[in-house]
UniProtKB/Swiss-Prot annotation:
Organism: Shewanella halifaxensis (strain HAW-EB4)
Protein name: Carboxy-S-adenosyl-L-methionine synthase
Gene from which the chain derives: cmoA
HAMAP family: Cx_SAM_synthase (MF_01589)
A single GO BP: tRNA wobble uridine modification
EC number per UniProt: 2.1.3.-
Amino acid sequence: MNSSTDNLFAKPYEQVSDFQFDDKVAGVFNDMIRRSVPGYGQIINTIGDLAQKYAATNTKIYDLGCSLGAATLSIRRRVEGRNCQIVAIDNSESMIERCNENLSAYVSETPVELICGDIRDIKIENASLVVLNFTMQFLSPDDRENLLENIYQGLIPGGLLILSEKLYFKEDKIQSTLDDLHLDFKRANGYSELEISQKRSSLENVMKPDTLAEHENRIRSLGFSQFSVWFQCFNFASMVAIK
């Protein structure tokens, strides 16, 4: 999955606009997310492992907020021969176009339906696996429970939700410590102080992280029988919930 180097915030802006998943971001997204999200590669690989365990024959798999298709590709490699259909959705035309190119580079018997649309408008049905990989944090807090309710209703019994999110911690010292470690991670990956500062300003109004307790309480209240964090590095985590 090719990507140009992310230097979108390398020059100073008089006014930093809100972050958008536009063509400029899509062109550097693979580099951006791997240099910004600790453990991203491990998460993508394990999504494939979990798909191998939970994808049921003759069911659907949903990748909600698929971006360039990394999770979809990881899943598709691991579910051959099960007559599954993957439905990959993103509201960015630029992401969908590049996702289609990435998927076309690999031959597979597992079909992928690519949809450019709002994940809040998609009816989940006959799903054995649903993936929200750093997607829900960009929805308004009011929309999150409705989305998860739709997912819960569309999952088959024993179906799996994979939810990866940046976390917020109410304990101020924990929050500041993990935030500092994340900033050090970005510095170690070549981002300058200017890039870090401007990217943070750009995301400030569009990404609203929840606490781990908020995630768990919301998921359990909808009826999911089991919940666990399977991965965490600093203030980034990936969770699983079983219907």
